[in-house]
Amino acid sequence: MASIIKANQLQDFGGNSILTSDGAGNLTTQKINYPAFHVNVDGQTISIANSTVTKVILTNEIVDTDNAYDTSTGKFTPQVAGKYFVYGAITYDKTGDFDDLQIRLRKNNSSSISEALDRNHYYTTINAYGTVDLNGSTDYIEIYTKQSAGAASNLMNNQDGSRNYFGAYRIGS
């Protein structure tokens, strides 16, 4: 025999709402993965100089739950402390080989969260991801890239933003 428990709100011992139902099956839960953002290349032409580590500023916001990503600086500065999952991808629009491709996810423009390297390929997407603790006030993250193809090279702009992107979301406190 099955049991039925009916409630329109589930609270913890502190009286904080964990789960709420409107009675019609629509649930409201805590925003546990917020703040979050995801930006990509869409309509941008981004040129990266040869053999130079360059910050990539993506301006097409798909999601920015707390307005924590600044499209003018390329910085994500969440105002909620916690551990964040950070990810990014870079693809160059080039038909020749690279001697060196790099992607770097950085905290406060100093410590590297994650890096990836690739060599001697063209139309290669390089990805990086990792976790980082952010203090909820001054800590920020950015995405950087470096390419060595002998001359400046553009990031691929395939109009749907699936090749070049950067994002993060909170995974815990």
Identify what each model region corresponds to.
Residues 4-5, 28-173:
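Extracellular jelly-roll beta-sandwich "head" domains, especially the C-terminal globular C1q domain
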Residues 1-16, 171-173:
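Short, intrinsically disordered N-terminal pre-domain segments
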Residues 12, 19-36:
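Trimeric viral appendage architectures of receptor-binding fibers, tailspike depolymerases
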Residues 15-17, 110-111:
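Short acidic/polar mixed-charge low-complexity motifs
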Residues 17-20, 152-153:
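Short acidic, Gly/Pro-enriched loop/turn segments at secondary-structure junctions
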Residues 9, 19, 67-69:
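Assembly/interface hotspot detector across virion components, adhesins/toxins, and nucleic-acid enzymes
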